[in-house]
């Protein structure tokens, strides 16, 4: 079997994106007001300023809670209707072995072979 015809692949033209203008060297002093969060007053609870490790532990607890004991395998079993092409997909298919290649009838060129 040989493939004939032209490929339909056409590369897209490259788009040129202009680099951002250089403003100058970035100094940390310029961002000192924006980087540090405002400190809460004495009467307000410090909900924004939490220890990152404590926040991460809280996330891990939620993930581990979902990984509890696994349900039985029977409850996860899904029923799929047979389409006639599942050779060896169940208890009936385990009894079937591979056919002897000498006994297999080869389809002629004009005949169509059923495909799943």
UniProtKB/Swiss-Prot annotation:
Composition bias, Acidic residues: 31-44
Basic and acidic residues: compositionally biased ranges: 71-80, 102-116
InterPro entries linked to this entry: GAGE, GAGE_fam
Region (Disordered): 1-116
Pfam families per UniProt: GAGE (PF05831)
Other known facts: This gene belongs to a multigene family expressed in a large variety of tumors whereas in normal tissues, expression is restricted to germ cells. These genes organized in clustered repeats, have a high degree of predicted sequence identity, but differ by scattered single nucleotide substitution. Their sequences contain either the antigenic peptide YYWPRPRRY or YRPRPRRY which is recognized by cytotoxic T-cells.
Family: Belongs to the GAGE family.
Name used for this protein in its record: G antigen 10
Gene assigned in the entry: GAGE10
């Amino acid at each position: 079997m040989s493939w004939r015809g032209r490929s339909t692949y056409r590369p897209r033209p490259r788009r040129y994106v202009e680099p951002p203008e250089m403003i100058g060297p970035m100094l940390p002093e310029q961002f000192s007001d924006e980087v540090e969060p405002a400190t809460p007053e004495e009467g307000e609870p410090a909900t924004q300023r939490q220890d990152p490790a404590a926040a991460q532990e809280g996330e891990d607890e939620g993930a581990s809670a979902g990984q509890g004991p696994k349900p039985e395998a029977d409850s996860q079993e899904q029923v799929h209707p047979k389409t006639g092409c599942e050779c060896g997909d169940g208890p009936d298919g385990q009894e079937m072995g591979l056919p002897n290649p000498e006994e297999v009838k080869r389809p002629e060129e004009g005949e169509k072979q059923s495909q799943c």
